[in-house]
């Protein structure tokens, strides 16, 4: 595991060098923990079924703030370790979207890379911010590109949207009822970091005519690693817990994070009020245990609709 990562704000103006793309948007001033903490009150009461949500009465909405967060990257190829491709990418985006630029940057004699690696670990096609939460690298994140699994990230994204829609409603009629143009526009908005375009389409997914049944929740639990020898868990691996969690309790009270963690992972989370043995982070920030799950989903889920929490031992 890499050394503890620094906050995005620590590198508001990442170094630039060969291969740098256009200047990246500045990192927002507030730490990402601040918008997440507002979810406890701002999103505690979801809108009535069928009513689209408006942005909360804050200077900058929580989702818009999260879409502005970016990660500085320092990318090299094994054959050119001293020729870095330096850029940054939004936390909600995907590394594979950089591959066309990296391929154009590398000499033609080098086979086109297809995968990204962190300390020898091939990275999965997950949102960049989730990868940072999992591996906690020092920033800028030093990655290598090489041959490996070819990513079809657009298809992966849309499959995730369909799965999240099914979990929310018990069916995927919301996304399946959209036109091809709309689903393409949804992915293009993520690809282009176009928050307004994404939000317009996503509002239709989050506000069906009936109340949602479950929150699309995935909890990522990193392993301690063991190098993989003798059957030990390979370094950098993690397991994913996914279960059906209703947005409200049997008493119709909004379901909050703390009791959910205690019920699903009682060994790691013996208390429903405070982190004792472990915490969870989302978009680089600890999440208040009092935050309602539906509020977290509406305000801080990744663009495919999944609320992805990473367990961090204390």
From Swiss-Prot:
Cystine pairings recorded for this chain: none
Compositional bias (Pro residues): 20-29
GO biological process: autophagy of mitochondrion; cellular response to nitrogen starvation; piecemeal microautophagy of the nucleus; protein transport
Key words of the record: Autophagy, Isopeptide bond, Membrane, Protein transport, Transport, Ubl conjugation
Molecular-function GO terms, alphabetical: Atg8-family ligase activity
Keyword field contains Amino-acid biosynthesis: no
Membrane topology: Peripheral membrane protein
Effect ascribed to mutating residue 263 to G: In strain: Guyane 11
One GO CC term on file: mitochondria-associated endoplasmic reticulum membrane contact site
Cross-linked sites for Glycyl lysine isopeptide (Lys-Gly) (interchain with G-Cter in ATG12): 162
Description of post-translational modifications: Conjugated to ATG12; which is essential for autophagy.
Localization terms from the record: Preautophagosomal structure membrane
Chain segments carrying region Disordered: 1-59
InterPro entries: Atg5 (IPR007239), ATG5_HBR (IPR048940), Atg5_HR (IPR042526), ATG5_UblA (IPR048939), Atg5_UblA_dom_sf (IPR042527), ATG5_UblB (IPR048318)
Entry-linked Pfam families: ATG5_HBR, ATG5_UblA, ATG5_UblB
Subunit structure: Conjugated with ATG12.
Function noted in UniProt: Involved in cytoplasm to vacuole transport (Cvt) and autophagic vesicle formation. Autophagy is essential for maintenance of amino acid levels and protein synthesis under nitrogen starvation. Required for selective autophagic degradation of the nucleus (nucleophagy). Also required for mitophagy, which eliminates defective or superfluous mitochondria in order to fulfill cellular energy requirements and prevent excess ROS production.
Similarity field: Belongs to the ATG5 family.
Protein name (Swiss-Prot/TrEMBL): Autophagy protein 5
Upper classification of the organism: Eukaryota, Fungi, Dikarya, Ascomycota, Pezizomycotina
């Amino acid at each position: 595991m890499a050394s503890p990562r620094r906050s995005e704000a620590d590198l508001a103006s990442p170094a630039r060098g060969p291969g740098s793309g256009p200047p990246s948007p500045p990192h927002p001033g507030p730490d990402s923990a601040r918008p997440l903490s507002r979810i406890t009150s701002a999103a505690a009461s979801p809108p009535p079924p069928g009513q689209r949500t408006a942005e909360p009465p804050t200077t900058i909405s929580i989702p818009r703030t999260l879409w502005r967060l970016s990660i500085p990257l320092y990318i090299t190829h094994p054959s050119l370790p001293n020729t870095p491709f330096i850029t940054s990418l939004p936390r909600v985006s995907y590394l594979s979207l950089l591959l066309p630029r990296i391929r154009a940057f590398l000499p033609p004699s080098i086979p086109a890379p297809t995968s990204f690696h962190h300390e020898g670990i091939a990275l999965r096609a997950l949102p960049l911010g989730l990868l940072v939460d999992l591996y906690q690298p020092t920033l800028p994140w030093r990655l290598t590109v090489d041959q490996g699994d070819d990513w079809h990230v657009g298809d992966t994204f849309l499959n995730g949207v369909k799965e999240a829609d099914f979990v929310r409603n018990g069916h995927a009629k919301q996304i399946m009822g959209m036109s091809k143009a709309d689903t393409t526009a949804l992915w293009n908005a993520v690809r282009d970091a176009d928050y307004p375009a994404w939000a317009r389409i996503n509002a239709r997914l989050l506000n069906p005519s009936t109340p949602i049944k479950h929150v699309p929740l995935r909890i990522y639990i990193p392993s301690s690693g063991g190098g993989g020898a003798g059957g030990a868990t390979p370094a950098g691996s993690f397991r994913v817990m996914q279960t059906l969690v209703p947005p409200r309790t049997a008493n119709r009270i909004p379901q909050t994070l703390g009791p959910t963690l205690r019920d699903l992972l009682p060994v790691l989370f013996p208390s429903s009020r405070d982190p004792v043995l472990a915490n969870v982070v989302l978009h680089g920030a600890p999440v208040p245990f009092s935050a309602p799950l539906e509020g977290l989903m509406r305000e801080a889920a990744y663009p495919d609709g999944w609320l992805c929490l990473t367990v961090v031992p204390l």
